[in-house]
């Protein structure tokens, strides 16, 4: 009897572990911190001025499924390579409300990606090809953000 109870408990907790591993996590996504040199805001601004590099600024949250999906495009080898031409800054909107308000020409939706000059000035002409939510790049494929990065490099360098 005791053996059956132990086996049943082992099976129950084993299943809980399997279900836990199979459940998707929306804890902000994996933004490729190994391949991309993400910087905090103040340090990133200083680095951009010093190295005369444009800035790619991304706002996200930990609870946003679109942000989790968008984080995956930053694993693309072409995006990783292109990121080296920028100072990459990633900010959690919920933890940086004042900055999120400052960078919200068409709203505080997420994720939002902006391209700034090395001096930290937003160029409003550099945005995704859409009328609404202009700073929302396609979350499902890297082509959209790559096109944005290429345009930013041409205009801001």
PLM features: residue spans?
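Positively charged n-region of N-terminal signal peptides that target proteins for export
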Residues: 1-4
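Bacterial N-terminal signal peptides
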Residues: 9-20
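Thiol-based oxidoreductase modules, predominantly thioredoxin-like and allied folds used
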Residues: 35-39, 79-98
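Short active-site neighborhood of thiol/selenol oxidoreductases, capturing the structured segment around
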Residues: 51-64
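Non-catalytic, surface beta->alpha helical segment in thiol-disulfide oxidoreductase systems
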Residues: 108-157
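A short beta-strand-turn-helix
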Residues: 37-53
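Boundary at the C-terminal end of the N-terminal hydrophobic targeting segment
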Residues: 21-27
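Typically the conserved alpha-helix immediately C-terminal to a functionally engaged Cys/Sec
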Residues: 67-82
């Amino acid at each position: 009897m005791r053996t059956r109870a132990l086996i049943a408990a082992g099976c129950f907790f084993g299943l809980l572990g399997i279900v836990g591993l199979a459940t998707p996590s929306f804890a902000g996504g994996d933004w490729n911190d190994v391949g991309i040199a993400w910087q905090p805001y103040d340090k990133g601004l200083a680095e951009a001025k010093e190295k005369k590099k444009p800035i790619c600024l991304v706002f996200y949250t930990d609870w946003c499924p679109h942000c989790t999906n968008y984080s995956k495009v930053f694993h693309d080898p072409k995006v990783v390579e292109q990121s080296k031409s920028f100072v990459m800054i990633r900010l959690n909107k919920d933890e940086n409300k004042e900055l999120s308000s400052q960078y919200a020409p068409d709203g505080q939706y997420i994720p939002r990606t902006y391209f700034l000059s090395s001096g930290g000035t937003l160029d409003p002409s550099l945005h995704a090809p859409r009328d609404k939510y202009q700073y929302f790049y396609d979350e499902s494929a890297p082509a959209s953000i790559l096109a944005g990065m290429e345009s930013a490099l041409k205009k801001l360098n």
